[in-house]
């Protein structure tokens, strides 16, 4: 009887896990890895790479794809509705990315667009992370704040680059993918690949996993 009871508990536990995974998502997450990837050893985007440091060179579009693929795998495991906007190593145009996002939002009505990037500057001292939304007060602001709150928890020793002039910490810009998407949209700058210390971190598999897990925690919190 004890063995049978333990068996029933085990089956019930597995069923609850499966039912939780099957729970309908509140949102459809449109994940966009910025820039191009690597095809036959050739990087598909001009620029958008670190200097050739002694420890290696970072290609932004490649790193963005690693993070997005990690997030997509986690979403699938959790039953969260997520779509890879590009699903390619080609450098898809901004206009095409926005077109795909808007078509999906027109169908599903519940999309949130998340564009994954890392930052660059002429000075190697520039460092930290930031999140951008379109200009003005929009539904994107709350999404950005949710992601920033999680990033502050995960990366307390790194600089949050922010703009509090409008009462929140996200930065605002007329970036094409933020201005012309019809759903809430944010663009995340995951540190500076032109900064030697941060570039070395961005090349580290464990740090890439940490970035992906950080953004997934934001998604999971918004899905509750």
Predicted regions and their residues:
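Extracytoplasmic/secreted envelope proteins and their assembly/folding machinery
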Residues: 65-68, 72, 95-98, 128, ...
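Loop/turn elements at helix/coil->beta-strand transitions in domains of secreted/extracellular proteins
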Residues: 25-27, 77-83, 107-112, 154-157, ...
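Short, well-structured alpha-helical segments in soluble
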Residues: 98-108
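Active-site histidine-acidic residue metal-binding/catalytic motifs
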Residues: 17-98
